[in-house]
From Swiss-Prot:
It holds the Pfam family DUF4518. InterPro entries: NTF2-like_dom_sf, UPF_C3orf38. The keyword Protein biosynthesis does not apply. PANTHER family: DENSE INCISORS. GO terms for cellular component: nucleus. This is Uncharacterized protein C3orf38 homolog.
Length: 348
């Protein structure tokens, strides 16, 4: 459910009404990670309000322009300095809604209104639909959102599409980054801030462009009964007009318990292979070199991490990369096996 109060929701609803249709639909895609497909403008506004964690997060969005907040406040009779910056306007709006609360208590209204009933019905429908998640579609929508957002941070492509940052990751997120270009190296990163900054540097400082292959061979997904979703995707790596090689990436996603139908990144394994290490035909349409059952192995291993007798070997398998073998929780032989081979080139 939304983290906005009733007054904040109504205020933001009126404020969003000042945006045009294209801006509303784009904002809905951003807030919901493109996992909600609104049927019309009102449905999109409803989704924006429901899936926003708080009013400040919503109003800070780049698509909610400073001029829109200023115009809304003027319509409400709130006088603010014309030169006020956006963060000040947000505070004016929050203060205005807070002052409306005592007035609301003095007004006798039915406890349950028609729109409340509709909201409850909508939420019940969403909860029921959440039980039947199409993980293939979720993976595809996630990859569209992730790579469009990341690539848009490349300074050669114009202004960024939206805010990139640690808010898209769990606070203890992990990244294992392996590359085989002019040299080979594997580096681990932990924490939402450092993980997001390392990924950002690929496009903002190294000027890379990651182009995912989202057909049946380039994208594979799997899920666990506990809500962990794993997405494997392959694609090509570019800089300007040059194709430098290919990449293979595994995402571990966990649904947020606070915002319905919103997922955050728990871990990423990223492998980039330079073109000199590849057969020419493998660059044309890279494919994921593991099966959904291999993705499930990541979950099986994670659930065993707290077991002292298997922790050392389990940690090796988690930290390795491709999942070339299926791991089952009872497979002692595989648990005792040496670290799986992350450093072998992708299968061609």
């Amino acid at each position: 459910m939304s983290g906005l109060s009733h007054l904040e929701s109504e205020g933001c609803r009126n404020l969003l009404g000042l945006l045009d249709n294209d801006e509303i639909m784009a904002l809905c895609d951003t807030v919901t990670n493109r996992l909600v497909q609104p049927v019309d403008r009102q449905d999109a506004i409803h989704a924006i309000l429901v899936y926003s964690q708080n009013v400040e997060e919503l109003l800070r969005r780049k698509k909610v322009h400073r001029e829109v907040i200023f115009k809304y406040l003027a319509k409400q009779g709130v006088v603010v300095p014309p030169t006020a910056e956006k963060h000040n306007l947000i505070q004016y709006a929050k203060d205005y809604w807070a002052k409306q609360s005592p007035k609301l208590k003095d007004t006798a209204e039915p406890v349950t209104k028609t729109e409340d009933i509709q909201l409850f019905k909508q939420q019940a429908k969403e909860d029921k639909e959440a039980e039947k998640v199409d993980f293939r579609r979720l993976g595809e929508e996630f990859c569209h959102w992730f790579f469009e957002l990341l690539n848009s941070q490349n300074p050669f492509l114009g202004p960024p599409q939206d805010d990139w940052g640690p808010q898209h990751f769990w606070h203890d997120a992990k990244l294992r980054f392996y590359y085989n270009t002019s040299e080979q190296n594997t580096t681990d990163y932990q924490g939402a801030e450092i993980v997001s900054l390392r990924l950002l540097s690929l496009v903002k400082e190294e000027f890379l462009f990651l182009s995912p292959n989202l057909d049946s061979q380039g994208l594979k997904c799997a899920s666990s009964p506990h809500g962990l979703v794993m997405v494997g995707v392959a694609g090509t790596v570019h800089r300007g007009n040059s194709c430098l090689g290919i990449f293979e990436q595994i995402f571990g996603l966990i649904r947020s318990p606070f915002v319905e139908n919103t997922w955050k990144i728990k871990f990423i394994n990223l492998r980039i292979i330079g073109g000199s290490s590849l057969a020419p035909e493998s660059v044309l349409k890279p494919s994921v070199t593991f099966e959904p059952s291999d993705l499930e192995a990541f979950y099986n291993v994670i659930t065993l991490c707290n077991s002292p007798e298997v922790r050392p070997n389990v940690r090796q398998i988690i930290d390795s990369g491709t999942g070339d073998q299926v791991l089952h929780s009872g497979d002692e032989a595989l648990l005792n096996k040496r670290e799986m081979n992350l450093l072998t080139p992708l299968k061609h």
